[in-house]
Amino acid sequence: MSGFFHGVTVTNVDTGARSIALPSSSIIGLVDTFTEGPGATAKANDLILITSEREAVAAFGPDAAITRACRAIYSRAKAVIVACGVAKLSDRAEQTSAIIGSVLADGKRTGLQALLDGKSRFNAQPRLLAAPKHSATQAVGTALVALADKLRAIAIIDGPNTTDEAAIAYAENFGAKRAFLVDPGVRYWDTEQAATVDAPGSAWVAGLFAWTDREYGFWASPSNKEFVGITGTGRAVEFLDGDDTCRANLLNNANIATIIRDDGFRLWGNRTLSSDPKWAFVTRVRTMDIVMDAILYGHKWAVDRSITATYVKDVTEGLQAFMRDLKNQGAIINFEVYADPELNTASQLEQGKVYWNIRFTDVPPAENPNFRVEVTNQWLTEVLDSAA
């Protein structure tokens, strides 16, 4: 500070809690095939930001598989799609490799790997990942889950779309909390082909996730929500209310989401393929991911600040306000936030490390409401009272 000064001095006091913003929960990362040509402006392995069906058609052409996947998404939801179209190949093994992708000598990422550039290119980090039909191949499904771990996303994986037994066998290849398997596929009317066609379910489910996020919140389950635009499923899935031996329940018991016909076609299933029961519900995984990323992105301002009592107080109050907002929205039930007195030792503080604990209870889906109905003669004599 300077010495004597005759006049008014104004100083910015840069303290106080900061607000924490929620990241978008429903940006979709999509990889599928197309053919380069006059009807497509995109080049193979270009990363494209898509916000409408019209943009998808312009980029990939009207008949491309990736365009059909975009249509499936937009049939239900207004969504931002980070899309990477790969060349359509005749060799199945080469096609699988193209979908999985890699990093080229010049540093360009291809296939699924290109989705990692969504945030740096478009400030759009995918939270829902799909490689329609291709994810029914284990190599692609595994790569999709690995990518989901990096992005804190959900990998929506297609089942084999053949039999229940095949779907259950395929599910046993995974044990990840970010893997969400759906089987069978869907059927819909394709205006380009003027016919009913079969399609993998993952793009349709991604659209349903995005719609649920918009209508109910990222903490809500897409299960028991109706699809728009489909006319059937790849195979009929038996569903009977109250019957725990029906085929839909058999698939759900194997942690496979399925599609039932019950007042429309509905997604039916809340569970991931996690081998850890703590992460069984997809809603818990997504809530944790969003909370963690919001805290991560919301505290860049706190890095390299001087560790003072005011600093600890400001961070704590900001976290409390953020969690309080989530509670008021219904995203969580309750929470606690505090600077950890045991971890914040003089040695740790001297190294520039400060620890906060954020604990919360998420909102589970009512997967199994139970109603106990009893018939009794308790009020039978009331007929006599009424007659008196």
Kindly give the residue locations of the regions a language model identified:
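Surface-exposed assembly/interface segments
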Residues: 1-388
